[in-house]
Curated annotation (Swiss-Prot):
This is Glutathione-regulated potassium-efflux system ancillary protein KefG. The keyword Magnesium does not apply. The gene is kefG. It comes from Escherichia coli O1:K1 / APEC. GO terms for biological process: positive regulation of potassium ion transmembrane transport; potassium ion transport. Pfam families: Flavodoxin_2. It catalyses: a quinone + NADH + H(+) = a quinol + NAD(+); a quinone + NADPH + H(+) = a quinol + NADP(+). Interacts with KefB. Its EC number is 1.6.5.2.
Length: 184
């Protein structure tokens, strides 16, 4: 008997999604997978008024939570930051009684406007990507979630169509069975 793939909630946050070729290409395979729920935060909450109980219910229903977004000022777009602050509340995701996400999996999928070489101590951004993403790793730990190695698409705008298609295939393969041995 084959086990079902883990249910994945893909939280997509891009304020200018229509202009992001890379993110649109990455999302395409996700929309074709029955175990993946793609949840576009900017489409659902253009006014930033987040339905916290609805979002928390979505989190409870999924085992793997993917945060897909561009890197904005060494962080995430504003709506995702608001979502993190409001939805991952004390008593739900952390603190006394806050164990609703314990044991689930967190993976960040990030697009950047600069090459990987820009993320070094001696380079333009002065820090490696692992340091830049540390707040997200800490948030996962606060929620008692397993932190999965991030997927980073560097210099997303400058990737060829073939390179983006290759990234999308690999991403889609992972989403189809995210907790398979070697899949994390």
């Amino acid at each position: 008997m084959m086990s079902q793939p883990a249910k994945v909630l893909l939280l997509y946050a891009h304020p200018e999604s229509q202009d992001s070729v890379a993110n649109r290409v990455l999302l395409k395979p996700a929309t074709q997978l029955s175990n993946v729920t793609v949840h576009d935060l900017y489409a659902h909450y253009p006014d930033f008024f987040i339905d916290i109980p609805r979002e928390q219910a979505l989190l409870r229903e999924h085992e793997v939570i993917v945060f897909q977004h561009p890197l904005y000022t060494y962080s995430c777009p504003a709506l995702l930051k608001e979502w993190l602050d409001r939805v991952l509340s004390r008593g739900f995701a952390s603190g006394p009684g806050g164990n609703q996400l314990a044991g689930k999996y967190w993976r960040s999928v990030i697009t950047t406007g600069e090459p990987e070489s820009a993320y070094r101590y001696d380079a333009l951004n002065r820090y490696p990507m692992s340091d830049v993403l540390r707040p997200f790793e800490l948030a996962a730990g606060m929620c008692r979630m397993h932190w999965l190695s991030p997927i980073i698409i560097y210099w997303a705008r400058r990737q060829s169509a073939q390179e983006l298609a290759s990234h999308a295939r690999a991403y889609g393969d992972w989403l189809a069975n995210p907790l398979s041995p070697g899949g994390c």
